[in-house]
């Protein structure tokens, strides 16, 4: 049932996946949480951290949804790009990555799609994980491109970097990659050096999940309605957890279509 004012089921519909969130408590549409008035002398740091935590959660959810919606049921490559130099400058690393993306876009035989996530090693050095539809790429070329861009950058005392390629052709491995990215995004997003910056980039041509909401009578405990929403699709993952803001329970399902 559709309602103009309230909902207790949230759907994110995509080409390859469907995400379902079923709320124990009915939620009003369009209601915004009022910001607390906090002086500069008290509470500012805590408020900034809470805001950042929410933003980080949204970013991770967005990237996992994009990975699953664009790369499940497909063949793709998972490329890890590292610097030999202990590079910790986020802006500099992202400049090098942007040049590399422009280079490898040219060798793609189809419209190039990608998701790239930054990760920090224990010593603080940056490296990247690049998911793209460039399946079984020419390893020699993609390695030469990465090394040559780094060598030409006078700011870096480095003679190149390394490239590791894993070709993915089944959904089990795709979900393994998705879980790996989720785990390390959680770690990276907490870095102070990323404050006000993104730890990921994506191509504009990715298929996005489309949101919709509905109101279903007693949806949280209504197994028939839950099964109808799942609609015989494969359950990739499921969870039940407590909403940090309302204190009420949420059921979550990620489905492969």
Give the role of each language-model region.
Residues 1-124, 134-257:
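Right-hand nucleic-acid polymerase module
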